[in-house]
Regions:
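Partner-binding and oligomerization surfaces adjacent to conserved cores of proteins
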Residues: 1-237
Length: 237
């Protein structure tokens, strides 16, 4: 079982939430996503994915290249118990659920295209965390992704969860891992929200055609929370 003691350098925001540092709380984060996310937020939920479900293995954390993923064990030497424990925690970490955001404040046309997104949600780490209903959650771990030239098999749980290769560095990712209080056989797709987190919404300049008035009425969004795309002028009529 993964616990807060596996991340001794992390900041304890609450008894169930740890983050890489307290400075992250005020960090602005953005997420390119589908319009369905707005429907979900209105209904008090937020979609998450299990870590093991990502098709790209490099999205899992440390990518275990078969040519490099080994440990030197002397003949007749037993694998240290601590190493076995860490390996077990790393294995169990694939059952964690994830929510991936970017800390970039700059709207990016390539991100719009890569995610085929309808909307961009902008909020802060604190606003998002404070909106989550923690009743059925055992632990949330949040940190910035660190980017490195290569990814090697690690005995460090933090590196396993928050390291990626440099090819992904333009994402400037902040990731939330969620450990639910459910049985391993339970199917989970959503975080439950105890309140709607404060955010601003931008609609894709590449595909979104609804008028601003339609958007405000449909999702009960205050007009001041809808912002225009800077990529194409008058992206919202």
């Amino acid at each position: 079982m993964i616990t807060t003691s596996d991340f001794p350098q992390y900041f304890n925001y609450s008894d169930k939430i740890i983050i890489g540092s307290s400075e992250l709380l005020d960090k602005t984060i953005m997420r390119y996503t589908s319009e369905r996310t707005l429907n979900d937020i209105v209904k008090g939920k937020f979609f998450v994915r299990q870590r093991a479900s990502f098709n790209d293995e490099r999205e899992h954390g440390i990518y275990q290249d078969g040519g490099k993923a080994f440990r030197l064990i002397l003949s007749g030497e037993d694998i240290p118990q601590h190493t076995i424990q860490i390996d077990n925690k790393i294995e169990s970490s694939y059952n964690l659920y994830t929510s991936c955001w970017t800390k970039s404040n700059q709207e990016d046309v390539l991100m719009w295209k890569a995610y085929d997104a309808d909307i961009l949600i902008r909020t802060t780490v604190k606003e998002f965390l404070d909106s989550i209903n923690m009743d059925n959650i055992r632990l949330i771990i949040c940190d910035e992704i660190k980017y490195h030239k290569e990814q090697w098999k690690s005995t460090n749980l933090s590196k396993e969860l928050f390291w990626k290769v440099e090819a992904y560095c333009n994402e400037e990712e902040i990731r939330f891992y969620i450990d639910f209080n459910y049985n391993s056989n339970d199917t989970i797709s959503y975080l439950l929200l105890k309140k709607r987190f404060k955010n601003t919404i931008m609609f894709s300049p590449l595909k979104y055609k609804k008028s601003k008035d339609d958007i405000i009425k449909l999702y009960n969004i205050p007009p001041q929370r809808i912002i225009k795309s800077e990529i194409i002028e008058n992206s919202l009529r």
